Regions:
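Short, aromatic/His-centered strand-loop micro-motif at the edge of beta-sheets
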Residues: 415-436
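Short tryptophan-centered beta-strand motifs in secreted/extracellular beta-sheet-rich domains
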Residues: 373-375, 433-450
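Repeated scaffold domains used in trafficking and secretory/extracellular systems
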Residues: 288-290
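Secretory/extracellular carbohydrate-interaction modules
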Residues: 353-413
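Short, solvent-exposed beta-strand-to-loop segments that form ligand-recognition rims
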Residues: 453-468
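Beta-rich carbohydrate-recognition and catalytic domains
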Residues: 1-168, 173-221, 232-283, 297-301, ...
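Ligand-recognition surfaces built from glycine- and aromatic
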Residues: 260-264, 465-493
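Beta-strand-rich interaction surfaces with strong enrichment in secreted/lumenal proteins
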Residues: 277-280, 361-365, 424-430, 459
Length: 493
């Protein structure tokens, strides 16, 4: 594994031609995705600034161009008309050099479309000459011409009553006429995660600190709360956030989680009253920093995209100097006291050819590199083995225990192992049993939707050349489609 110096990690991008050789090298990787957004070069992580504007979906992501390292972050810009096929527009926000408020990174944030502009709110990561970090909440404005204009001064700096871990501004409108709120992920001096609330009557000026969000029962729930958001979905308030350094049953050794709490938000008292426990958004191995779209034209359409990765983890493609992709977009609804995540109906447009299943002498079928597998599960125990060899052995296993009524995803059978410190299994109880699985398979990922979105398992996988079969056990009715590419592989900086 390459050891990066500080100078290498925080090198400024001066000319796109500096990246041509790296792009030419990584584009031939066997693990480059076909229908998922991924880093053009280097590393991508959090999705940012997800909005509907000018008849297109706009999405940005955290991008470090030089390699698979969390170094100097930029905002890279992509667009889509249907949330299925995507086009690269290139880098949008770059760090200012030397003394700028974001001189060591344009960190995560959100966006709000107003008139003919998109307002981009982000955390400016500033380092002084002694390498002490200072966080600033900054603003840029993007017009139809595609050129961003940064505001010369930040909206505000870090609040002194909290640690320097203050970032990920989420802009919220529609609470009160003519008023905007902003949520900031933060951490108390006692190292407890929290959310700070700011308010303004003007998107561009006059932001003032309202206070810390009260969430009764969650006063000491992990450390820093990253990527906070309060969404109104199906008439319910939902607090979505990423608590760090927290152990949760069924999550193996993972210490970083993405989840939500259902409840009621009172903006006057800054109190979010929970209506239950913390729920994990995605039970798989690799999902974090989920972002919901700001869509002021259709507030009832809640769409979520997340980073298909987790902090502090190395992936096999790190050796190729690239890492990271985004999940498929998911539509959010409420069922009872739970969020339901389902693949967007538009994703059916990716279906290319329905595959006739022809098991070989070992009961294994060929598994296309890009595919959708749908299974009706009629009764009893179920086992689905993906990415096996031609004998149906090894691979990633999905197993349902009908006695315990729980589903488990186990990737210990894959030949390429990584992140073993966080375990190789993830388990989720299913109160009503297993009825349905819908599985999206790309060259280096698998997304498993259980019972029409009651649970989701998202994981990176890196199958070797011999791991391109699958095998099923149980009373199942399967359908398999190949999927066509949805993201054009192109060098655009």
């Amino acid at each position: 594994m390459k050891e990066w110096t500080r100078e290498e990690k925080y090198r400024y991008l001066k000319d796109p031609q500096e990246l041509v050789g790296l792009y030419d090298r990584i584009r031939g990787s066997r693990y480059r995705q076909t229908f998922h957004n991924q880093a053009v070069t280097g590393l991508m992580n959090d999705p940012n600034g997800f909005v509907w504007f000018d008849n297109r979906w706009h999405l940005f992501y955290q991008w470090c161009p030089w390699g698979a390292v969390h170094g100097l972050k930029h905002w890279y810009h992509i667009v889509s008309k249907d949330l299925v096929t995507w086009k690269n527009l290139g880098v949008c926000l770059l760090p200012d050099q030397e003394e700028g408020y974001d001189n060591k990174g344009v960190y995560s944030g959100s966006a709000m479309p107003i008139g003919d502009k998109i307002y981009l709110y982000y955390t400016g990561n500033h380092r002084d000459p002694d390498w002490i970090r200072h966080a600033y909440t900054c603003l840029a404005r993007l017009g139809n011409d595609g050129w961003p204009e940064k505001y010369p001064l930040p909206l505000f700096g870090a609040h002194p009553d909290y640690t320097e871990n203050q970032r990920d501004p989420k802009i919220i409108c529609g609470v009160e006429e003519g008023t905007y709120y902003m949520l900031i992920g933060a951490e108390t001096k006692e190292k407890h995660g929290c959310v700070l609330v700011y308010k303004s009557e003007d998107l561009q000026h006059g932001w003032h600190f309202e206070g810390e969000l009260s969430v009764p029962g969650f006063e000491a729930f992990g450390n820093m709360w990253e990527c906070p958001s309060i969404e109104r979905i199906g008439g319910k308030d939902v607090l979505i956030f990423c608590p760090q350094h927290l152990s949760i049953p069924g999550r193996g050794g993972s210490q970083n989680h993405n989840g939500y709490i259902m409840g009621t938000m009172d903006w006057k008292t800054l109190t979010f009253t929970p209506d239950g426990q913390f729920h994990v958004l995605d039970f798989g191995f690799d999902s974090y920093a989920a972002a919901c779209a700001n869509n002021i034209e259709d507030a009832d359409k809640a769409v979520l995209i997340a980073w298909m990765g987790v902090p502090d983890v190395s992936y096999p493609t790190d050796e190729e100097d690239w890492a990271g992709c985004l999940t498929l977009p998911r539509e959010l609804t409420v069922r009872g006291r739970r969020l339901i995540q389902q693949p967007l109906p538009e994703l059916k447009k990716l279906r290319e050819e329905k595959v006739e299943l022809r098991p070989n002498e070992f009961g294994a079928c060929k598994l296309p590199e890009a595919a959708e597998l749908e299974l009706d599960c009629r009764a009893g125990h179920v086992r689905v083995h993906l990415f096996t060899d031609e004998r149906g052995e090894g691979g990633l296993e999905i197993r349902y225990n009908d006695v315990k009524r729980e589903i488990t995803v186990d990737r210990s059978g894959l030949k390429t192992q990584f992140n073993l410190q966080e375990g190789t299994e993830r388990t989720r109880p299913l109160e009503n049993g297993l009825q349905h699985l819908r599985i999206f398979i790309d060259r280096s990922s698998v997304e498993i939707f259980v019972n029409d979105g009651d649970a989701v398992f998202t994981s990176r996988v890196f199958p070797q050349e011999t791991e391109h079969h699958f095998r099923m056990e149980g009373d199942l009715f399967p359908r398999l489609w190949t999927l066509k590419p949805a993201v054009k592989e192109e060098f655009l900086i």
